[in-house]
Amino acid sequence: VLEPNEIDRIYASGGKVYAETKNGAFLLRLRLYEAEQRLANSSFVRISNSEIINLKKVRGFDLSFTGTICVSLSNGTVTYVSRRYVAKIKQLLGL
């Protein structure tokens, strides 16, 4: 059983949903929206249609001139916020 504070991100790939931790990726028996609902009152935020990240595991954000946001996680994973979610993330960051 994974604890929410262990999870760096939750993502969908190939029709399956995975929780990524420092120890690897684990298959979840949930849809992404179900995982998002279960973690609604925590530090998790959706950054694209296929990914949710744990804000407590973010090492840094890199804003580019083109408006995209690159996210570096504590486990070394680098991912991007989709255009649809950029405004929401900027609001969370106070930008």
Which stretches of residues belong to each language-model region?
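Short coil/turn motifs at secondary-structure junctions
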Residues: 76, 86-88
